[in-house]
């Protein structure tokens, strides 16, 4: 997996995954065309590439030999990527392929976009400023399973979780290797390999057609799967806030409702990315959640770290991403809170988690039996 990170259009990193045997390097060489104003960027400190080369490499697991896996394309400044677009994730470095886009409403507390929609604050939530929503493109993608071991320390091996399609309210299933990726995190490339991504759903969802651009086109099974499971896959709202150079992005998803004795229990999944935008090394130590339910209850949850980890965010590895779940005995509610971080000197500081809605959208349960 090429593990270079593009930030604000600049890519200049070399990562050594195995100190004894395996090296991965990335060369990024965009020519100045159109509105793409970027310098030529070389991700090699040992002059192992010819200066005219425009490919990124992925090493074979058994040795030092580098093999070509594709050729970079210029990122799209306007418009969206199509189904079948191969890409490298600019933050986590994995290879992936676009399945289809989502048009989300981004609520960014760090800017004041000119948009018509706004999100009101829930009772007791921090802050009082109005937040405007702006349309932003995200993508449902498949992750190359070969790259999952290399990103496990910075991100969970992403999976879409869902409730079982039978009466067992405790059952939770997952489709591993699915992720949601923002438009600016896409580094597009092309490949002549007919199976460039290793994932059990790749050949089920996509087929190779060299006469098309991109050359991987959707099968009917992908269209049917998207249509059938649209309510539970749909990404609608994204919330973002930065405190002392730590940016927190939250994406909630409604999963469905289950009956529990005499009440209904509504379930949501939420994905959180923590990103260090500064140079100082910090470590996440604690989480503090407040969960407000439409039924009138307010719950406080405290704990060490997140998902059993206390990730360190540094300039070399600035981001960490994870997913979790929450349930309410009401069709809607709100969540917000803080993360406590520790600096190198030992002092602590709090980072705000932006308030986000838990909405059921009036959905009724639909089975996820299509893939199984």
Feature annotation, model-predicted:
Residues 104-115:
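Short, solvent-exposed secondary-structure boundary/capping segments
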């Amino acid at each position: 997996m090429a593990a270079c990170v593009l930030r604000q259009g600049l890519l200049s990193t070399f990562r050594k995954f195995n100190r004894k045997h395996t090296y991965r390097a990335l060369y990024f060489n965009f020519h100045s065309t159109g509105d793409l104003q970027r310098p030529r960027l070389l991700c090699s400190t040992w002059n192992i590439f010819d200066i005219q080369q425009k490919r990124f490499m992925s090493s074979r697991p058994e040795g030092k030999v580098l093999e070509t896996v594709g050729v970079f394309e210029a990122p799209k400044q306007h418009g969206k990527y199509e189904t079948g677009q191969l890409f490298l994730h600019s933050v986590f470095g994995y290879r992936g392929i676009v399945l289809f886009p989502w048009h989300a409403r981004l609520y960014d507390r760090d800017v004041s976009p000119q948009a018509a929609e706004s999100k009101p604050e829930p009772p007791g939530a921090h802050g009082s400023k109005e937040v405007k929503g702006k349309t932003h493109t995200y993508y449902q993608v498949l992750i190359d399973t070969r790259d999952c071991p290399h990103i496990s320390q910075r991100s969970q091996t992403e999976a879409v979780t869902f409730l079982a399609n039978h009466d067992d309210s405790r059952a939770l299933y997952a489709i591993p290797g699915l992720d949601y990726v923002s438009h600016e995190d896409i580094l597009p490339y092309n490949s002549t390999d007919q199976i460039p991504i290793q994932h059990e759903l790749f050949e089920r969802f996509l087929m190779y057609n060299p006469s098309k651009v991109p050359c991987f086109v959707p099968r009917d099974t992908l269209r049917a799967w998207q249509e059938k499971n649209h309510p539970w896959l749909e990404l609608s709202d994204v919330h973002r806030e930065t405190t002392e150079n730590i940016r927190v992005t939250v994406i909630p998803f409604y999963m469905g409702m289950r009956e529990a004795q005499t009440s209904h229990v509504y379930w949501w999944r939420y994905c959180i990315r923590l990103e260090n935008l500064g140079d100082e090394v910090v470590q996440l130590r604690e989480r503090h959640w407040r969960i407000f339910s439409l039924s009138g209850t307010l719950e406080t949850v405290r704990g060490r770290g997140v998902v059993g980890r206390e990730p360190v965010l540094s300039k070399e590895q600035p981001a960490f991403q994870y997913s979790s779940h929450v349930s309410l005995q009401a069709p809607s509610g709100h969540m917000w809170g803080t993360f406590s971080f520790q600096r190198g000197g030992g002092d602590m500081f709090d980072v705000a988690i932006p308030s986000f809605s838990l909405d059921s959208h009036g959905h009724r349960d639909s089975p996820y039996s299509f893939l199984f």
